Amino acid sequence: VKLGGYGGALVKDVIGVYVEEFYPFREATVELSNGYHAKLWGELSRLNGAELVAEFKTGQAQGSVAIAKRKLGSSTAWYQGTELTDDSQRAFFRGIAADLGINATGLESTEVIKRGPYQIEIDHKANTVKVTKG
């Protein structure tokens, strides 16, 4: 076992989160400080240069980092130290997409891709989808 936190230098030094331990939850779900919910497992961790997005509001890791981000030049590294519920995971990804100027508001089965001035929408199920211009 190598001491110094889980994830090594990538997580600790680049992303900026020091992970001490991970564990399964006793509860079915736990609440995060931003209103999201996590399931199954989480990490006992602390910031090491990253910006806090959400911490565990309930459960054994209350007060520990659940989601963090760190600006690295013109990019942003995101860290998710838990498994979010399906609704929370979708909201998390949509929030990141919105920060990047990507429209991610379609159906769950619809993939939206922007290539230059073109927007391509692909429905991966047999749904009828109305697409509006703009």
Each model region followed by its residue ranges:
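A conserved amphipathic helix/loop scaffold
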Residues: 1-134
